């Protein structure tokens, strides 16, 4: 992808929902991992936290009651996981990004994982309707000794209904634009940076070295303080299990940490249908969760609904 805005520069939006959600998870003696702080403004909420795996892991579901992101909306989500706590966050369904009508929409997510804490950031996919102008930014910063697994997925258009994100009928939709900013860091030191921009007619949409004409892109990342010698066989095991066909293509890579920094394991997916991309993400999580988080891979019940 081509270079775009710096990670800190999520553009201000014109009139629309201005929403904020600030969550903090802590570890309490005799209680385990708990949601210790929740503050919001605008239409962002968190459901009552649950502990389906026992007190050690706090599950939380993030809600956006309007049901979609419209032109001019600006959403900000801040999550902090304190030492010793383990939080798993997901969403109840796809986030729909509607036609922007000349007003860009944006969502910025800032995740902070403190020493000895664990975060699983597992939202469902982002679906861009025809003419959506969307900016999505994710900034994860881990303290030494922290662990995190997360993913994101982008669907360009409602392909099941024959709708394309960058076309209305046979004509390109000039307003269609997607800006992505991802930053993973440890102690403020970058581990992985990705910035890019797509728009209607962009060559990357059809390029065999980019989107290859497929409407879905997904990424899974895992950061853990394991030595490189322990991460390499895990990366190879993951890569060997991944599909490569006309319907879904996936690959894995390992970014070695430098100077004592943790390594980052990346899984990238292109797919024609979200079901195929989702299956690859779930299988990656099932492999990595026991190995890196020392927890059985028990999918949240919400994923089955």
Swiss-Prot record:
GO molecular function, one term: nickel cation binding
Subcellular location: Cytoplasm
InterPro entries (alphabetical): UreD
Pfam families recorded: UreD
GO annotations of cellular component type: cytoplasm
UniProt KW keywords: Chaperone, Cytoplasm, Nickel
Predominant cellular place of this UniProt entry's protein: cytoplasm
Complexes and interactors: UreD, UreF and UreG form a complex that acts as a GTP-hydrolysis-dependent molecular chaperone, activating the urease apoprotein by helping to assemble the nickel containing metallocenter of UreC. The UreE protein probably delivers the nickel.
Biological role: Required for maturation of urease via the functional incorporation of the urease nickel metallocenter.
Family: Belongs to the UreD family.
Protein name: Urease accessory protein UreD
Annotated source species: Delftia acidovorans (strain DSM 14801 / SPH-1)
Protein's gene: ureD
């Amino acid at each position: 992808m081509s270079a775009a805005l710096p990670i800190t520069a999520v553009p201000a939006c014109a009139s629309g929902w201005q929403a904020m959600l600030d969550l903090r998870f802590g570890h309490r003696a005799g209680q385990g991992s708990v949601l210790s702080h929740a503050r919001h403004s605008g239409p962002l909420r968190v459901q009552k936290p649950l502990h389906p795996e026992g007190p050690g892991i706090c599950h939380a579901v993030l809600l956006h009651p309007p049901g979609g992101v419209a032109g001019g909306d600006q959403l900000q989500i801040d999550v902090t996981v304190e030492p010793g706590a383990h939080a798993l966050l997901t969403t109840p369904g796809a986030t729909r990004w509607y036609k922007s009508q000349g007003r860009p929409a944006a969502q910025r997510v800032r995740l902070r994982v403190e020493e000895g804490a664990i975060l699983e950031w597992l939202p469902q996919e982002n679906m861009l309707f025809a003419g959506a102008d969307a900016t999505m930014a994710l900034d994860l910063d881990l303290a030494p000794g922290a662990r995190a697994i997360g993913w994101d997925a982008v669907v360009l258009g409602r392909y099941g209904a024959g709708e394309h994100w960058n076309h209305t009928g046979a004509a390109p939709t000039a307003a269609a634009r997607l800006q992505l900013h991802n930053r993973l860091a440890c102690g403020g030191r970058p581990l992985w940076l990705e910035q890019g921009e797509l728009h209607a007619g962009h060559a990357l949409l059809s390029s065999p070295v980019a989107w290859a004409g497929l409407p879905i892109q997904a990424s899974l990342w895992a950061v853990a303080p394991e030595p490189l010698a322990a991460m390499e066989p895990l990366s190879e095991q993951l890569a060997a299990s991944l599909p490569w066909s006309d319907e879904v293509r996936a690959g894995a890579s390992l970014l070695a940490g430098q100077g004592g920094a943790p390594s980052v394991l990346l899984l990238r997916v292109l797919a024609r249908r979200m079901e195929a991309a989702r299956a690859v993400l779930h299988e990656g999580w099932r492999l990595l969760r026991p190995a890196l988080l020392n927890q059985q891979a028990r999918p949240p019940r919400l994923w089955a609904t």
